[in-house]
């Protein structure tokens, strides 16, 4: 763990479970990481691995049939230390933090915007609640945010409803809403999924400006390893509710020591290697969340697995900044 002065958010042994029909889905099962001020932590992994649930837990936006079973979520606000997991989900203190100090860009813009209010109203609502701006200043700021997101004719679009926006424009409106109050922590869940590459570059540049100008800490959830290589300072690889490997971007991308990390990297085509390059898909699929394998969750899909993998490995420090949860990490590191 880093010095607390450099940490914006610290998650320690977090466990978030879902309960349905007398069954329990351990969606997040003992996750620990730090997000440093002015740095980007990229969280990668297949769908269903617990990335979005981790983000929703930090924001206290979990559904009714879910519970934080154990762990801490510590938000370092100036000189104050706030345990988010102890706050009421819709209590006054959590509402003050959410959207202002910690903001989130949601994965699905189609359902995140309210269809009965204009897009401008929904962005302005955040500014009205969390700032001292007057109506004219709020409107100017809202138009400026839409302009920065590359939305054409923002003076007109600000008064239009979500159905008038394309999918990509709705995504950009959601990003504008999240960036409105210059948050201390920005959680971005697949923020550029519906956007073309030029707009993606523009959005990532804006996120970079937040880091540079306001020392914002960013948690970026993505499947795109190219984005990870370009933007990440630190990387956490998740699989079935656990972080299986974490470290600096250089550690994880250049020296992967968990078979899942290596499999993810091997499954991505590399520009410049030509059409005959060997791309290796990950065999099998993620297990049923209600019928998990014993021990290492990746073992049924792993080429290195043996009997030792019937017991979940402890976290091992490869270096001061590089951690892995695997019995076979030495073999993989040498491979």
Regions found by a protein language model. Give the residues of each.
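ABC ATPase nucleotide-binding domain helical subdomain, centered on the C-loop/LSGGQ "ABC signature"
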Residues: 136-151, 158-159, 254, 262-266
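Charged, flexible cofactor/metal-binding loops and thiol motifs
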Residues: 81-82, 248-335
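P-loop NTP-binding/switch modules centered on Walker-like glycine-rich loops
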Residues: 187-191, 195-277
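Conserved ABC ATPase signature
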Residues: 160-165, 169
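A short, proline-enriched helix->beta-strand linker immediately N-terminal to the Walker B motif
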Residues: 180-184
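ABC ATPase NBD Q-loop/coupling interface
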Residues: 72-96
């Amino acid at each position: 763990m880093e010095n607390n002065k450099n940490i914006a958010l610290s998650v320690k042994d977090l466990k978030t479970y879902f309960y349905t029909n007398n069954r329990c889905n351990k969606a997040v099962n003992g996750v620990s990481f730090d997000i440093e001020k002015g740095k980007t932590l990229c969280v990668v992994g297949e769908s269903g691995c617990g990335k979005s649930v981790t983000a929703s837990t930090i924001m206290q936006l979990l559904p009714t049939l879910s519970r934080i079973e154990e762990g801490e979520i510590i938000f370092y606000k100036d000189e104050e230390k706030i345990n988010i997991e102890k706050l009421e989900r819709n209590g006054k203190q959590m509402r003050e933090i959410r959207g202002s100090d910690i903001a989130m860009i949601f994965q699905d813009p189609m359902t995140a915007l309210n269809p009965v209010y204009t897009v401008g109203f929904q962005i302005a609502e955040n500014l009205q609640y969390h700032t001292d701006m007057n109506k004219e200043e709020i409107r100017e700021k809202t138009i400026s945010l839409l302009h920065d997101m590359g939305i054409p004719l923002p003076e007109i679009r600000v008064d239009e409803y979500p159905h008038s926006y394309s999918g990509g424009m709705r995504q950009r409106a959601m990003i504008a809403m999240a960036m409105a109050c210059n948050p201390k922590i920005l959680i971005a869940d697949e923020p550029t999924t519906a956007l073309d590459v030029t707009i993606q570059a523009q959005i990532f540049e804006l996120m970079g400006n937040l880091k540079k100008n306001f020392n914002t800490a960013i948690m970026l959830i993505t499947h795109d390893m190219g984005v990870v290589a370009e933007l990440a300072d630190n990387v956490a690889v998740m699989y079935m509710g656990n972080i299986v490997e974490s470290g600096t971007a250089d550690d994880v991308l250049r020296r992967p020591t968990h078979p899942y990390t290596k499999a993810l990297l091997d499954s991505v085509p590399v520009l410049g290697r030509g059409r005959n390059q060997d791309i290796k898909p990950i065999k099998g699929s993620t297990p049923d969340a209600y019928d998990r394998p014993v021990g290492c969750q990746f073992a049924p899909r792993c080429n290195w697995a043996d009997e030792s993998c019937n017991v979940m490995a402890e976290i091992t420090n490869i270096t001061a900044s590089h951690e892995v949860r695997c019995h076979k990490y030495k073999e993989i590191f040498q491979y």
